[in-house]
């Protein structure tokens, strides 16, 4: 992480990539990036293409941005701008998009950043084995959780770094670096060149503390760690916004007391405001709730009679 440097990249990727290729054996200097935007904004390949004389295939699905991308490299015949949305199945998989170009099967660098189906697109790549793969993960998901967003082009959720590590191992890659939002993976035959003794997520982690959740005996939910809407840069007080029980029910009287009044109030709230389930830890059901209502009516009648 000491090699972070930005020429066009967002979080020091340019410097990290430069150092990685200082250690990797010399290749054919080919790179692939999607979504490429205009070829400059937050680009992980612009420095290689503009300053290092690399060749590249840049893929951008947005029809408005593709003109800017073509304009950026209009005087560079070694860059091939493509207007396509990369898919994980069907005709527009990455293997098919790359096949018309003179790009080696083991080209040097693949950058994947589409804010969603990154996992499924890398998984679908079969013919090509780039030396280095940079891929965006959802940094709000803790490093010990495996989460893969559904394979759906209409969704933009992202997947966890652990999911990418597991996928990488299946495909013959090893993690060598993590920055704020990207994982860097090299083909396993080059891993020893980096002298990394421990490439676990915990050892390489350099991103903000992810959100953790736990609950207290009275039903209070506690949220610890980064509390903001990820892409909206909006702070959120989750300890106030995401409580299952209202404050008046988070009281020892409702937890421990055998008082019928307190238990009646809780069951009424549970019946009308909490999601119904077939059973709960104490065996309460909707039928039991109505049974408590009848019992409480009887209790009130007896009090009145007294």
Language model features by range: what are they?
Residues 2, 23, 229-231, 254, ...:
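Hydrophobic transmembrane signal anchors and adjacent membrane-proximal interface regions, especially
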């Amino acid at each position: 992480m000491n090699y972070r440097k930005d020429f066009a990249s967002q979080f020091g990727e340019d410097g990290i990539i430069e150092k990685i290729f200082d250690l990797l054996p010399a290749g054919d200097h080919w790179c692939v990036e999607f979504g490429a935007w205009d070829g400059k904004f937050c680009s992980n390949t612009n420095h290689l293409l503009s300053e290092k004389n690399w060749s590249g295939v840049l893929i951008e699905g947005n029809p408005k941005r593709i003109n800017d991308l073509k304009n950026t490299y209009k005087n560079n015949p070694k860059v091939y701008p493509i207007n396509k949305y990369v898919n994980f199945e069907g005709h527009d998989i990455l293997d098919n998009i790359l096949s018309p170009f003179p790009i080696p099967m083991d080209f040097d660098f693949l950058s994947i950043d589409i804010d969603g189906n990154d996992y499924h697109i890398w998984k679908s790549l079969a013919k090509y084995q780039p030396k280095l793969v940079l891929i965006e993960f959802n940094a709000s998901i803790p490093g010990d959780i495996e989460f893969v967003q559904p394979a759906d082009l209409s969704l933009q959720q992202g997947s966890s770094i652990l999911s990418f590590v597991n996928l990488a191992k299946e495909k013959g890659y090893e993690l060598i670096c993590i920055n704020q939002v990207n994982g860097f993976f090299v083909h396993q035959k080059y891993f020893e060149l980096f002298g990394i003794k421990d490439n676990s997520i915990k050892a390489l982690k350099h991103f903000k503390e992810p959100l953790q959740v736990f609950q207290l005996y009275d039903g209070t939910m506690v949220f610890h760690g980064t509390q903001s809407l990820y892409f909206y840069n909006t702070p959120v007080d989750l300890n106030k916004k995401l409580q299952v029980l209202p404050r008046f029910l988070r009281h020892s009287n409702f937890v421990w007391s055998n008082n019928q009044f307190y238990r009646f109030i809780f069951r009424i709230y549970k019946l009308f405001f909490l999601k119904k389930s077939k059973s709960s830890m104490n065996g309460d059901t909707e039928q039991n709730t109505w049974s408590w209502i009848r019992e409480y009516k009887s209790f009130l009648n007896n009090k009145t009679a007294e």
